[in-house]
């Protein structure tokens, strides 16, 4: 029997307010439409520090039209973490090496597509280019 995989620490403290939904549709009040959701939204106050969930290299830092200020970090085992809705001017640059727990940025309000939701981090995880449910890899807080 294979040993259980140890889950990583979450990028930010808070409860998931929007779950991963690639096989079903969620209703976006902001966009007034049904849509899939390739990540999770973790409720956290604006300005809260966001930390790397695993060691890796910063692949991109950019502003996405829908998800706002975004940082992508790729691990050596082909996992890509996408941290979005960050505050402007994250402290990391493309090519930077990060360890698990290093500062990626802070929660912002730059995601136009999710501005109707409470303050949160939008977090996506990909394995070999395919979106995977972050809750299978990260130990997030559960609703009380």
Predicted feature descriptions by range:
Residues 1-67, 100:
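Surface-exposed, glycine-biased beta-strand/turn segments
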Residues 48, 77-79, 130:
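Short acidic/polar mixed-charge low-complexity motifs
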